[in-house]
Structures are given as structure tokens and as C-alpha cells.
């Protein structure tokens, strides 16, 4: 009897150990376009609150990640998409890649950053904005005036001194191209981009890179992310972060691809107050109603925000990118 009890006890302990190990080994594949330098912090915070789940990040810029998800449509590899532009999420939903879901805590979010349709499938994390990063030290050396409008950037004095994200690779680039098209009108916007292209040194495949290059003095001007400009300026880069009237902006969002319990818990946590308290360290506008903060050196964006139609950005994406690539892709940097 004693031997049987010992065997049963050992067996129960073994089953418990195996179950614990199985839970510890549970991994969720998350596709993202969040900036690389914040991924470790988000992963660590989530896993601290959910020790039985591990996040496996797959990261690329918005355009490349959107194309990857569409290419995998018939055999999805992602379980969650977290930190991708709202216009891309709208497109993914239209293509049947995102599952309708009601995450815990949805009522605590600002509704204007979420999927506007009744069968909601994506939910805002933050809003991100474009800006012009202007290196004042380089400008002084080259005698370049400080630009105050988009039209200023077409002046011959800036020839070869501007970097901008390729919109086919970067959501930051695509949302600014969309802002020009939606607010200038298509004919005027394409004419504007032709004039701007004369002054472009190169197009990057990262939304933050033009501002990083401006901060390092590799170019004088980078059309880029306002949050990156603010961060670099706070770190000591000689930058002015300029917001011309009609700056592009968009929500960054999360959505469910596979309906596992673990994937749902990632989505739930991503809209939580704890997650939003991390977002606000970089983004001054976040989805949670109770989370507000001031980001050092972040420009006043509200007065100069373009009117943005995110559904149109999603539906016209392929058409716009094909036209842009045909006209301007020759100046793009090589893809790494």
C-alpha cells in the first residue's frame, strides 16, 4: 500500500511538473512594426504579468509587415498583430486575416483609435505623428533656412539634403503620402511629390531612420516620426522638430489572428492600463482614457494634423504604392 501511495504521489508530481513546463513553454508569435528598441521592454512587462506565456516577436517596418501578412493569408504564421498601423489593420480585416474580438477593458479606450465597424477586430494602442526633423547645426554650416511648410521643402536650396521613408516599406512614409493626397487633392499632391523628389537624397525603408540620419548630421532634414525626433532632441541631438500644417498621423493597433486563449490574453494585455503606461513613454497620445503624460520636446501636433481617412488608406494602398514606386523608387536605399 505504501509503495502504491508513493508511486501515485510520484506520478502526480510528474504530471504537475509536465503541466507546469508545458505552460512555461507556451509561445505566441506576434507580428509587429513597433520600433526595435522598445520590443524588449514590452515583452518583459507582458511576461512578468503572464509568466506562462512567452512572446516571440517578428518585426519589420509597416509596409513590409503588411505585405508579409497578406502573403501568408492562406497559411497565417502570426497569432497576434500588435503595433501595426490602423490603415494596415483595416486592410487585413477586409482580407479576412483578423478575427472579430471584444478584448477585456475595451470600454476604457478612446473609441476614435479603434476599428469603427460594429464587428470590431482591431484596437488602438497609440497615435503616432509625422514631423520634419531639422538639424540646426548642419543647417548653420550649409546656410540652410529653417522650413515651416511642406512647400518650403521643394525650394532648390534643400537639394540633396532631405531623407524620407519609402511609403511601400514604411507606414510613416505611407501616412504622409496619404495625408498629401487626401488634403492637397491627388493632382496637386503628385505634382508636389515630383518637386520634392528633386531635393530628396534618398528614401529609407524605416520610418524613424530619416530623423536618426538628421540627428547624426548625415542629412539636414528628415521627414520622419515626431516621437523619434522628440527622443533624439531630448538625448542632445541638435534638432528642431517641425510640424507643418497637414502632418500625417495614424493609430497603431492590435488584432487577433488566431483564436487561442494565449493569443487573446496578449491582445487583452496590450490594451491594458499597464501597457498604455509603457506606450506613453514614447507616444504622447495613447488609447487608454486614464493614461496621459507629457513627452519631452514633443511638438504641438494637434493644430496641424491632416484629416485622415484610414479606410481609404487601406483600400487604395496598392494603387497608391504602385504609382509612387513607379515615379520615385529609383532613389530608395538598398534593402538590407
Regions of interest found by a model, annotated:
Residues 20-24:
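Sec/Tat signal peptide C-region and signal peptidase I cleavage site
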Residues 25-90, 212:
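Early extracytoplasmic/lumenal segment of secretory-pathway proteins
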Residues 87-91, 215-238:
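A ligand-binding cleft/hinge motif common to bilobed small-molecule-binding domains
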Residues 111, 157-165, 192-197, 203-204, 233-258, 270-292, ...:
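Periplasmic-binding protein-like
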